[in-house]
Amino acid sequence: MIYRWLLLVSCLLLALLAQRGAAKSSSPKIAPPTKIDHKPSSLFYFEDTDTVLMNTVNGDLLRSVDAGETWSVVEGDDGGMKHHVLLIRQHPYDNKKAYALGPNGRHWVTTDQAKTWASFNIAEFPAIRHYPLVFHGGDSSKVIFQGEECAGRYCIVRSYYTTDDFATVKLLRESTGGCAWAVGHPQFAEDLNLAEEIKDRSFCVVPGLKVPLPHANRLVYSDDYFRGNAEGTETKLQEGRPVSGVISTAAVKKFIVAAAKSKGTEELALYVTVDAKNWHRAEFDGHRIEEDAYTMLESTNYSLQVDVLTSPRSGMGVLFTSNSNGTYFTRNIEHTNRNSEGMVDFEKIAGIQGIVLVNTVQNPEEVESGSAKKKITSRISFDDGRTFQPLKSDGENLHLHSVTALRNIGRVFSSPAPGLVMGIGNTGNHLQEYAECNLYISDDAGVTWRRAIKHPHKYEFGDQGAVVIAVRDEGRVDKINYSLDHGKEWASVELQHKIYPTMVTTTPDSTSLKFIVVGSLKESQDGEHVIYSIDFDGLHERKCEEDDFEKWPARLDEHGKPDCLMGHKQFYMRRRANANCFVDEEFKDPQPIFEACKCTAEDFECEYRRTEDGKGCVIPSPLTPPEGECKKPDDKFMGPSGWRLIPGDACIRDGGENLDKEIERSCKDASSPSTDGKIRVTLQLLEARDYAQYYYLERQSSSSGSDETIIMLSSEHEVYVTHDHGKTWERPLKGEEITRVYLHPYSSDVAFLLTDGKEGFWTEDRGHTFKPFQAPAPPTQDRFLQVMAFHPVHKDRLIWTGAVDCHSGDCHSDAFIKKGRGKNWEPLLSYVQKCEFESRETRPNSTNLVYCEQFEKQSKNGRLQLLSSDDFFNDNEVQFVDVINYATMSEFIIVASRQPENPDSLVASTSVDGRTFARAQFPPNVQVPVQTAYTVLESSTHAVFLHVTASSTEGGEYGPIIKSNSNGTSYVLSISAVNRNSLGYVDFEKAQGLEGVAVVNVVSNVADVSKKVPKKLKTMITHNDGAQWMLLPPPTKDADGKSFGCSVVAGKGTDDCSLHLHGYTERKDERDTFASGSAIGLMMAVGNVGDHLAGGDEADTFITNDGGISWKSVKKGKYMWEYGDSGSVIVIVPESKPTKTIHYSLDEGDTWEEFQFSDVEVRINDISTVPSDTSKNFLLWARLSNSEVQDKFATFNIDFSGVRPRPCLLDENQGNSDDYYIWEPKHPFQENNCLFGHSEQYHRKKPSAQCWNDWRESHVHSIGTNCTCTRADYECDYNYEPQSDGSCALVPGLPKPDAMEICKKDPDTIEYWEPTGYRRIPQTTCQGGLNLDHFVSKPCPNKEEEYKQKHGISGVGLFFAIVTPLAVAGAAGYYAYSKWDGKFGQIRLGESAGTSQSFLSRDSWLVTVPIAIVAGTVAVARALPLLVTSLWRGASGFIRLGRGRGYSRPYASRGSFAARRGDYTSIVDDEDELLGVEDAELDEDDEA
């Protein structure tokens, strides 16, 4: 018995020993490889699982549930996923969800880690330029799907949303920049108790209310998926006001960042919020942020990291770190290395606060000059970027390849394995090529490094750093290297196949002992690939115990002791490098240990920003001292220091620094000397004799600076520059003779100063510095030709027109092109007159489109031909062979060429796409047999205004203005006999900022002008874009309160009594316009009241504040004027006579004050301010004579900034406020404020509000409503002309236009409409109402069947056509029956006296039956024809699905400006009759 027990025990011991021996193996286990036929495009693990998804380039989706050992193809329930997965996305905040997007509108979602997939349908291709999926940070069931439709640079994004994992999908809205959730990250607003308020909030970048171009984009939000308010609420990004030009938004941990860019600058404004409500503009310590020139980097929980491009040519930047609310950024390190895709060599060490690895450029000056390649060096910071130091290996500097040379998936250097960091690099002076580098490793978070293995490798960490693997990353390999002691000792294991490795990866938390290695069997990495699964589970026989771990400090200070960051030290319990065990805690992340520190200065930040010396904080606004303090300026009071403890900082206050305590401040700090109510004057006497021209470098709304820069060219050709609006002047190019100045029209910080030779100068920093440049030839000698042309998109792409062969007698102009900064000038075309870039955002595939006028046969005696090219004239196309000139305006190119059949006459042609031209069809009532000149006036409202010279007799020039349709080809007469001068300029001006308002001067005595009688001019105004014109109503009193010597009728101007204004042809400076784009509704002018425009000596000065409907006399005599602060201040000064005073108004011209700016009288040549009229500074250009100087050129700066104490407060949601009211432009003949089918609303400062607008851009508050159509929404069609009653009639003797022309142009068109004489104004958005352009539709030839199918009544329609009249008849009969009460005319005051029924009571059959029959018969007889007609007309065109022509979207979304011609249902006349509005309809017809 004892023997048996001994034998049993012995066997058990042997079995146990044998089992332990099997547990420890000498090498990792490699599963049989899996071969796939196509290259993987992406791969990811579901976090905390062994489940892996892999997408291949052929559209297959593979799944592994055992960390890559085995794989299966995911086919879906019906096999639809096979070969149809375009891309896969993992939910970043839910480890159970993933999404597979298909190319054909069918997509799939899994909520159980790819065990099952549910399909959903969205008929959109996933967005490429925007995120196709946007995830909610708080509710993983909420996802936004985005598809896009692009034409050139412009895209329409359609965003769909789900709140139930795509079980249901709804359209969120259309936009231009996509949509995003407010809660875009789990950390967003998590401590602010806003969960309920913002849980459903979404932001969308949508088109501007008026202009569908990027510079007008808006950021709107909705808390109900845009159901209650389809337009959404505009986000107040800057000081409680909306901002235009929003490009995109991004969620970065606890921040949301929005980027905006204005027209005319590349500078971006970044706005940041931490609560989705309050936004602030981020400041970058004086640095500019430009589009595609900043990168949002991996950020912390308490700050943003941004790298800003500073050198576009060479790819270098500056690294910035923000304060805790993301508003003020501090520069960390200069010359960071970037690539052309915006990737930055920057990475935070995973799991450890405050350690950052960056690469910088050692030789920035040489690289910038183009004389050397980058020398890249690596730097590391252990204090969150405050200081950086070199990486060290064996006493030498170490440099590592980083993000710009990414060779594997995942992070570059680190993983969640505490303290372990690896990289490919070399020691020495700078970084070498990748192939020359080795693998280095650090196990103390980058403090010290050692070489691990020679040659570059792909690498990965496992088991919290207990295992490190590396696969050589050059050529074919057949082995894997691994280390179990933090890279000190290495071993290897053979692979079955030789591969070119493409991926080495493991679980995201690096806690697994399993790895995946993917490689290609071909060097090209196309075709067949192999997947290996490597398992290290058997290499150690035991799991680590407590003694195998060490308490490892994550950060050390310069003395080698644990360092504090954000108020605490950080430690990890980490496996010792030599421990003979595995951690084997799969999917359990290492947990940091924190120990609090006492507060130091590093735990505080400035609430706004630091002082220049970095030792204190700037207080953003004047301090308010406590009540009773500051009785004297030299007194002191206790006020804020400007410091605050960084939010989230856990330092111990007791015994530590206390920078945020109040400090003693001088009462001088509490005063604001600039707002003392006074106007300030600064006189500057200049050495120049006079000015020849001056140029403002307008600062755009997204620009960060505040300078007001002017470049002035003196009469001696010397340049003067001021950055403070003339308070001080400097001469940066003293001694240089500058003959021309060109401002870059698409980049307002850039200007070019030319000489008469090849030498020139340019500035890109608003005149602070000027750099010389060499032109390929001297400027063209033709003073009427422009020397420089600029590309609208590529700001460094230029065309230069220069004089060539001028010493040989064959002086002509050649064009040269510079294709980018740093590029050389290249010849473009010889013997040219003008060359221009024709790239436009609304013109697809036009990036390289160039137009040039070239003399035929390269001879100045040849005809001038117009050429176009897409490849800089390697090839070209002749557009016209005999042109006079061409002009580009808005979306149109208009060409004037000679008629082949009559060379003495011109013909106009128009193109929208820049490829095809159509000959302009002039209206027959414009009889100009020999067309000698055109003037293109304006085309901002989707139509061209063209002046055709009818008389070119000297002193008697005039002609009609005609207006085009939306493609610029068919014209109608807008107004006749408009004044022109000998240079071709026309008395026509659009009121800036107001749709459809324009002013002209017409020649009223045309018959006499041909007899050499001087022209008599009358001023007329239109409020509906030239469809109707009226005389200007005069003021009731003149400036002295006296009546004018004439009278008006019903407040309207008459031929004998109206206001007439001196116009464009009489201006010294074309910039002196009536109106301002920022002072909406205000216009000023000089003129007189009477029967025609009198001479300048009889002129007075007038103002209107309602867009020209009513006018007021301001001053007797002629004055020059300028608007400031968007119209809240207006300054006028006498023209052409000595003065020492100006007059100004602070209430839109209601009252005027006088201000003396000089002790002696001076003669003012001009008054100016910034072109946007948003400054509080004005500049008087004068000639001064006093006891000290005689007739000296001088400037006076008049500064109003101290007059008012504060900026105005605006609440966009309320509209009206204490400082603002909502103003709507009106039409003098309409009561509903509708212009172009909608009413607009603007914020205007109340004249009584004592505050400043401080807004650089005029802002539409809203498009109030789309109105019903009226006569004002129509203009006369081709071959029709307006009559005296406002109607349109066919021109006598002319046929109606061929309505069937549309059928010939488009074979797919089913129907055409008989002409009515009217057409819709191109920009109107009206809906319903008066339908003047469509009455009768007819089928196109051979389209009768399709026409019947489209308009025929269905069985259901026929049923209702029969039943409805009968039902109406029955209802009418019952009504008569129920209301009859026995006697006609009976009035009952109480109950009937008796209860017996009379023969004629209402219940008597003698009454009920006849009445029912009669009423029914009458109702049927009346209703049936009307209803049948209504149904027929309704089916035959008043409800239309399309008109058989291409639908061009003139606006960016369906919601705003949706209406187009013929897209809306109208109520027909007979339906109006049924509704009882016959009389109203007749009245409206009479008016029409």
Swiss-Prot record:
Transmembrane segments: 1352-1372, 1406-1426
Leader sequence residues: 1-23
Localization (cell): Golgi apparatus, trans-Golgi network membrane; Prevacuolar compartment membrane
Pfam family name, one: Sortilin_C
Membrane topology value: Multi-pass membrane protein
Residue ranges, Lumenal side: 24-1351, 1427-1488
Parts of the chain on the Cytoplasmic side: 1373-1405
Segments annotated as BNR repeats: 63-72, 380-389, 440-450, 482-490, 720-730, 1102-1112, 1144-1153
Glycosylation sites: 301, 325, 481, 845, 967, 1266
GO biological process: Golgi to endosome transport; Golgi to vacuole transport; protein targeting to vacuole
GO CC, any one term: membrane
InterPro entries: Sialidase_sf, Sortilin_C, Sortilin_N, VPS10, VPS10-sortilin, WD40/YVTN_repeat-like_dom_sf
Keyword line: Glycoprotein, Golgi apparatus, Membrane, Protein transport, Receptor, Repeat, Signal, Transmembrane, Transmembrane helix, Transport
Repeat among keywords: yes
Keyword Protein transport among UniProt keywords: yes
Principal localisation: Golgi
PANTHER family: SORTILIN RELATED, SORTILIN-RELATED RECEPTOR
Function: Functions as a sorting receptor in the Golgi compartment required for the intracellular sorting and delivery of soluble vacuolar proteins, like carboxypeptidase Y (CPY) and proteinase A. Executes multiple rounds of sorting by cycling between the late Golgi and a prevacuolar endosome-like compartment.
Family of the protein in this entry: Belongs to the VPS10-related sortilin family.
Protein name: Vacuolar protein sorting/targeting protein 10
Species this protein is from: Aspergillus flavus (strain ATCC 200026 / FGSC A1120 / IAM 13836 / NRRL 3357 / JCM 12722 / SRRC 167)
Lineage start: Eukaryota, Fungi, Dikarya, Ascomycota, Pezizomycotina
